């Protein structure tokens, strides 16, 4: 596939690996990684990836804070929440801050594929 950059932000190394493996099966393999919300913000500003997957509960800055700052920097940023935990309030706040979608962990490859197709269809 085309060489699009995808940022994966999760404090769990295993979760990042699982998401990368699922995305690779969809034909994409150019990844940036972050282990907390602040790293996600910094990485986004430096590399401007086309798609961001972010967990909600993380150290330093959580996913909601990361989404807010990323979207403040780039209102067109395409951010997807991927989380197994998080309160309804946190999920609502993530959507209000500009998250485009939510995927529940554990996720299926088809769910990841649907998100990626929706993002890049027609490019």
Language-model segments: residues:
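Two-component/phosphorelay signaling modules centered on CheY-like receiver
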Residues: 13-32
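Acidic catalytic/metal-coordinating carboxylates
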Residues: 36-39, 62-65
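Active-site beta3 strand of CheY-like receiver
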Residues: 47-53
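Receiver (REC) domain active-site loop signature in two-component systems and cognate sites
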Residues: 58
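Short, conserved "switch-loop" micro-motifs in signal-transduction and mechanochemical regulators
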Residues: 85-86
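C-terminal output helix
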Residues: 89, 107-116
């Amino acid at each position: 596939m085309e060489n699009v950059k995808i940022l994966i932000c999760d404090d769990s190394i295993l979760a990042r690996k699982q998401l990368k493996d699922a995305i690779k099966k969809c034909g994409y393999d150019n990844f940036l990684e972050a282990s907390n919300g602040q790293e996600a913000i910094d990485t986004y500003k430096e590399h401007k990836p086309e798609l961001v997957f972010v967990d909600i509960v993380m150290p330093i800055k959580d996913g909601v804070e990361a989404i807010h700052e990323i979207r403040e920097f780039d209102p067109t940023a395409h951010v997807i929440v991927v989380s197994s935990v998080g309160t309804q309030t946190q999920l609502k706040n993530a959507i209000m801050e500009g998250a485009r979608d939510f995927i529940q962990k554990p996720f299926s490859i088809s769910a990841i594929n649907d998100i990626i197709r929706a993002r890049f269809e027609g490019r």
